[in-house]
Design a protein with these regions (language model features):
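Active-site-proximal loop/turn and secondary-structure-junction residues that shape catalytic pockets
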Residues: 9-11, 38-42, 79-82, 116-120, ...
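Acidic (Asp/Glu)-rich catalytic clusters
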Residues: 23-30, 52-75, 98-108, 136-144, ...
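Conserved beta-strand positions in the central sheet of alpha/beta enzyme cores
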Residues: 35, 75, 113, 150, ...
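Active-site acidic/histidine proton-transfer and metal-coordination neighborhood
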Residues: 60, 65-69, 82-183, 193, ...
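Glycine-rich, proline-tolerant flexible connector loops at the mouths of alpha/beta enzymes
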Residues: 35-63, 122-123, 222
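N-terminal small/glycine-rich loop or linker at the start of catalytic domains
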Residues: 1-8, 73-84
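Histidine-acidic metal/acid-base catalytic patches
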Residues: 1-12, 16-30, 164-186, 191-308
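The substrate-binding groove and active-site-proximal loops of carbohydrate-active enzymes
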Residues: 9, 49, 81-90, 121, ...
């Protein structure tokens, strides 16, 4: 099983908004298999939310850096919004997701993760139908580019009107969507906040589970720390993966283990402009990432899973 981490880990250390920028620091983390974060492209005048091909320059830069540093791309994370309440944002998201699917093809990435979108005031069934209607519009894109989109579990803690929170609900969504290229990404941190027995969730997803977001927390907030810093039972996670014969990657999304001052949802207190210790420097974060690689290797090898 490959150990993977996301470029979102280092994004804050680069003023360049290009999705390629964080790759410049990934070679000092110990990871060679990369989850490419395309989730932060929903900003004003972003090439990703406009018609045209300017966003492809960023993808070409990704290819160049990956070749120079010996990386390969295993999965991606598409942009997202929290709710359908703003039509302009929803339209921009549609363009950005469509471009992210094509970007995956250019980078030989087999799948990209998407989020469920809340429909405020709706029943669970109305929410489900609205999300299916929205994501079905990408059917042709996924087929043309041979790229899967993977729905990720949320939590009622921060989005109480988002009704995709468990393995059973994810499986129901995928089956009801009836899209050949729609499958599942399970987020262990979200599952821990939701209070799930993650063996049961993983078994419920079964063969539809194609990717993971591995991170930890104390069960109260979506803190995105590395494993063993919170209360997630990772024995249950790994046992569940073995039980279903999971064949995907072990992908970390622990981008706030060493927290920056503005890292949601746990913000550093009483920060002043003159403070020198508010944000960890890049080189220390890279060392933390290297430690996380060793933790992941130990976790998998403890269950006789070979690390690639």
């Amino acid at each position: 099983m490959r150990l993977v981490t996301t470029t979102a880990d280092l994004k804050a250390y680069y003023t360049d908004k290009s999705i390629a920028a964080p790759l410049n620091g990934m070679d000092k983390t110990g990871f060679k298999h990369i989850d490419l974060s395309i989730s932060g492209v929903m900003y004003k005048d972003s090439p990703w939310i406009q018609n045209g091909d300017k966003w492809k320059f960023e993808v070409e830069d990704c290819l160049k850096i990956a070749e120079e540093k010996g990386f390969d791309f295993c999965q991606a994370h598409s942009p997202y919004i929290n709710s359908f309440e703003n039509d302009e944002k929803t339209e921009a998201l549609t363009v950005a997701i469509r471009n992210s699917i094509e970007a995956c093809k250019m980078l030989s990435i087999p799948h990209t993760v998407v989020h469920p979108i809340a429909l405020y005031g709706a029943t669970p069934n109305e929410f489900l139908n609205k999300n299916i209607e929205y994501y079905r519009q990408f059917t042709d894109d996924t087929e043309k580019n041979n790229v899967d989109i993977l729905m990720e579990n949320s939590s009622s803690k921060w989005n109480p009107q988002c009704y995709i929170r468990t393995g059973k609900e994810l499986r129901e969504f995928v089956e009801k969507s009836d899209m050949p290229h729609m499958h599942i990404c399970w987020d262990t941190g979200h599952g821990n906040v939701q209070g799930q027995n993650q063996i049961d969730d993983i078994v419920a997803m079964g063969s539809e589970l194609k990717a993971l977001h591995i991170h930890d927390n104390y069960g109260n907030e979506d803190s995105h720390t590395m494993p063993l810093i919170g209360t997630t039972n990772f024995d249950n996670v790994v046992k569940g993966l073995l039980k279903i014969g999971y064949g995907g990657d072990f992908t970390f999304e622990a981008c706030a283990t060493l927290r920056r001052v503005n890292a949601w949802p746990n913000y550093r207190r009483d920060v002043k402009d003159s403070d020198l210790l508010s944000n960890p420097p890049l080189y220390i974060v890279q060392k933390q990432q290297a430690l996380m690689y060793e933790v992941g290797k130990w976790m998998l090898e403890s269950y006789n899973i070979k690390v690639e």
